[in-house]
Amino acid sequence: MKRKYMSEFGLHTFSSFVSLCYPNDLQTVSKEPRYHIYMINKIPKLTFIKGSLVIKEDSISVGINIKTETDNKSKTIDFSFHPLFNHNLFKYIIDKPSKSLTIQGENGGGAICRVLPFYLENGGYLDCEIVYIGQSYGKKGERDAFTRLKSHSTLQKIQSDHLFESPESDIAITLWEFTPRLLTSFDGIRKEFEKSSQEDIDHMQKVLENPPLKIDKQLINITEAALINYFKPEYNQHFKNNFPDVGHDYKYYYDLDFNSILVELDPSAINAGVYSKEKKYKVFNPIEYTLHPEMMRKSMFDIFGE
């Protein structure tokens, strides 16, 4: 099959910031990143182990229990919240659900450590099962994930189902900020293409005059659709079996005659991995789709194939 153009173009969206929290901790997450996509996850049930606290002058250690459907293990974490403080002078309280460790000073001040961020920030690793993917980008970019999730009916249903079906796990939210990049592929080996040299130049000029370098609704639409089609989360209905599709709300990339889309996640930034019942994601192995059927359009990444 001949390549359509000598110069082919694709969209690459990659995660530039990611956060993971419990639903009732959303208000504590930094709102500085512009989160565009959220995932509702099942994660191992984490709890502080009561009675495990060992307090020394210069440090503290505490145990965390990590429970899944198939395993139950613990991890001891040693930490110091300030090298000059005598840690014996503080009061330490683990709450009833064993999700928070409160550190109180003599004057009543202090801090609260939630088990999930505490575990991840101190070398813990979590596999996160994706059960739903959604976007938090409104028509004019006005809606954020925090507003969207406050009264999210699907989140409420997942939490309700989870109480009865998966008591060995917790529900968490992964928030993703994405950054776009233009991919370009030139084939200088072959001499014959479906389109002429002038058509190739016209196509290149059209794309370079409208590069996908700004976040907009269509960019988030196509990123969300690609993620849903790849992972096929349990609670998603749309895009599971009909992506890509020229009739969906990302027609911009068809109008510019893009060849492909790549979506890249980096959950390792927060010591996590992501998977669904359908697929496990591997870091540095991006999700790749051609926007046209293989029998009609050669992939821009297929340089050496016939």
Predicted region positions:
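Boundary/linker segments flanking structured domains
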Residues: 1-306
